[in-house]
């Protein structure tokens, strides 16, 4: 193992990278509440892993979506556990996100020069809520169907462009297969990609600027 490590060390300077990561100064006022953001990130990773596992069995069609979820829960080995973990970690992510934003706001972490860190955090909050809205519809049961119908109907109140936005979200005039396909694509590809990008930006800015001082 030593020779393998030395081979990589000679080419990538792994030790220098590790030293830079572990030697970052942590202010003495930092407490457990400053770790809440890390819990949000951990919940996101659990979401990605458990969601990826379910894509092997889930079928995003109005005829088979509900039965495929039933199959995951009853026939797939540990499928019930994987889906439950996905649901529990989703709730944990939302709860910890709210607490994290409260902590940042109450400790003034949004002030100069960290305004952009706050902005990326707000964008991540919007993406998290979008995860909830799109994921809620995927079982395509009565609750999911009517939730989608109500949510996608909200923009209709916007003058001039409201109807066009509704059709864009639904993939047509009414809720159906095109709507489910759109929500599935958003939930499994678009939103995870955007979340990963903005999380990286968020972390890099925190790394660059450090943790905000006490009030």
Curated annotation (Swiss-Prot):
Its main location: plastid. It is a multi-pass membrane protein. The chain crosses the membrane at residues 32-52, 90-110, 116-136, 186-206. CDD domains: Cytochrome_b_N. It comes from Gracilaria tenuistipitata var. liui. The 4 large subunits of the cytochrome b6-f complex are cytochrome b6, subunit IV (17 kDa polypeptide, PetD), cytochrome f and the Rieske protein, while the 4 small subunits are PetG, PetL, PetM and PetN. The complex functions as a dimer. InterPro entries: Cyt_b/b6_N (IPR005797), Cyt_B6_PetB (IPR023530), Cytb/b6-like_sf (IPR027387), Cytochrome_b_N_euk/bac (IPR048259), Di-haem_cyt_TM (IPR016174). Gene3D superfamilies: Cytochrome Bc1 Complex, Chain C. Keywords: Chloroplast, Electron transport, Heme, Iron, Membrane, Metal-binding, Photosynthesis, Plastid, Thylakoid, Transmembrane, Transmembrane helix, Transport. Heme b 1 binds at residues 100, 202. Heme 1 (or BH or b566) is high-potential and absorbs at about 566 nm, and heme 2 (or BL or b562) is low-potential and absorbs at about 562 nm. PROSITE patterns: CYTB_NTER. Belongs to the cytochrome b family. PetB subfamily. It comes from the Eukaryota. Heme c binds at residue 35. GO terms for biological process: photosynthesis; respiratory electron transport chain. Its cofactor is heme b; heme c. The gene is petB. One of its GO terms (molecular function) is electron transporter, transferring electrons within cytochrome b6/f complex of photosystem II activity. This is Cytochrome b6. Heme b 2 binds at residues 86, 187. Binds 2 heme b groups non-covalently with two histidine residues as axial ligands. Binds one heme group covalently by a single cysteine link with no axial amino acid ligand. This heme was named heme ci. It is found in: Plastid, Chloroplast thylakoid membrane. Component of the cytochrome b6-f complex, which mediates electron transfer between photosystem II (PSII) and photosystem I (PSI), cyclic electron flow around PSI, and state transitions.
